Every structure is written in C-alpha cells, then in structure tokens.
Amino acid sequence: MIQRPPLPDGMAPAAAAVPALETERLVLRAHTRADWEDYRPVLMSDRAEYMDGKLDHTGAWACFASELASWLLDDIGYWTAARKTDNKAVAFVGIMQPSVYPETELGWLTTEEGEGQGYAHEAANAALDWAFGPRGLTTLVSYIDPRNARSITLAERLGATRDDDADRPEEDDLVYRHPRRAA
C-alpha cells in the first residue's frame, strides 16, 4: 500500500498534485468540494458576464472540475485563493490552456466578497512568479473581453501589455501579454 502524506480537510489525494502558494494574506491551494459553494455563485451570476455569460449548474460544475483536472493533464490549473485568517475562498486564479486557447492563459475570478480587496492581484502575482519560476513557462497571456474594464486594469497592474497581433480564442478578445519574470 502506498503511504500518502496527510492532506487538509476536504482534499482528495489527487489534490496533492497541486502546488500550494502563499502570499501575505492568501493561500493558493487546490479546489475542494467546500469551495464549490463560493465558486458556483460567481459563474451562475452576472459576475460571469464577460466570460460568455452566466452558466447553469452543469456548466459551472464543468468549469470548476476542469480547472482541477487541468493539473493532472497539463501540470497547470486553477487555485482557490483563500484568506489565511479564515480559509474563506475570495478568488480563483489559475493558468490553463484549454484546447481552444492558442496560448497558455493566466485568468482570475473573484467572489463578491473578494471584489475590490486586491486579492486577485495578490494571487495573480503569486501565480505569475510560479509560472515563470518553478513551472518554467516562457510566455503567458490573459484573454479579456474588451468590456471588462476591471480585468484590463488588473492585467495592466500586473505589467501585461496588449498584443494586438496575437491569436485569440474569440475574435473580440483582447490579448494581454505578461512579461517574463526572473526565475
């Protein structure tokens, strides 16, 4: 029998494949079933307006599960960004390349409670450091709906610049290219 190290409550053994990252206020960790209760309202509400619109329960679950499955398939995926003080999910940040994406993308979602607190910026910075450091990626973009002013502002705060020549999954998407960080 294979011995596995103990995992935090609510995490399945496959979650051990997801690297945990820490920032000043957050822990970026694998999604757990408990996080679904914070994730679902984001994708099933108007908060998903710039991500192809709000989804039904099945569509939201498919997104949640694919973000975790991506770790097993590609060694990249989404993290739940949880506050250190209470382990409450306040954002979901990750690196993925679904089959329809021409390049690997850094993306983010915030819960209503997490909006405007700087959590997505903090978590995305940690994800960028990991992507260009230990993970060894050489390029990373964010695909953003041109109406999503908050995400455009966040991408620019992260140092990304528009790349109008890049391929994109949706014709209207803006592509923001993140500068490579020192490993």
Named regions from a protein language model:
Residues 72:
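Extracellular/periplasmic catalytic domains that process cell-envelope and extracellular macromolecules
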Residues 75:
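Beta-strand acidic-aromatic groove motif in beta-rich domains, primarily in extracellular
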Residues 1-50, 61-69, 78-183:
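Acyl-donor (CoA/ACP) binding surface of acyl/acetyltransferases
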Residues 57-58:
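Conserved phosphate/ATP/ADP-binding segment of small-molecule kinases
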